[in-house]
Regions:
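Collagenous Gly-X-Y triple-helix signature in extracellular proteins
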Residues: 1-164
Length: 164
């Protein structure tokens, strides 16, 4: 799979990158209609750090450094994309919107196929007022949410460690 990533935020231990577009294919957040356990216990989190991570070349994964969760890949959060929590659980005041995501076009993503259809994609926040749903970005680049057992696009985030 050939993908492009954009640098979105510098941290002490590395640079965070987010894919420019979604991976080919769609994935459910969970196999059932629930957000119980949040992203941390979701089927998609497990899949991201196994079968999806295995799609990345070793030259890239060797340069990755884990996030605080221990994961090499994760989904973006609602606040990183939109600068606030419109539907999802509230995030720390220290989480800021990534500068490139202030432009709506940079929140939009294609589906990873040669047809280049605009794609809805998952965010990691579970919805406050809806037991079966998680936050998402719609094809127009706006905040929304979707039922966890439905399949949407995936736009992974990873961190490349600083070279000392």
């Amino acid at each position: 799979v050939k993908v492009q990533a954009m640098a979105v935020q510098q941290e002490e231990d590395g640079m965070i990158f987010c894919l420019v577009d979604c991976l080919p294919g769609e994935y459910p957040m969970n196999s059932t209609r629930t957000n119980e356990g949040g992203y941390e216990e979701s089927d998609l989190r497990k899949k991201l750090n196994s079968e999806i991570l295995n799609l990345f070349p070793a030259e890239l994964t060797d340069m990755m450094t884990p996030f605080d969760s221990g994961d090499l890949l994760r989904l973006p959060t609602e606040k990183e994309i939109f600068g606030g929590n419109y539907y999802g659980e509230y995030e720390s005041p220290y989480v800021k919107q990534w500068k490139p995501r202030k432009k709506r076009r940079n929140r939009m993503a294609f589906d990873g196929t040669k047809d280049e259809n605009l794609q809805w994609y998952w965010l990691m926040n579970k919805i406050r007022e809806s037991a079966p749903s998680f936050s998402s970005v719609n094809s127009d680049g706006y905040a929304y949410y979707y039922i966890a057992s439905y399949s949407l696009g995936v736009r992974p985030v990873f961190k490349i460690k600083n070279i000392v």
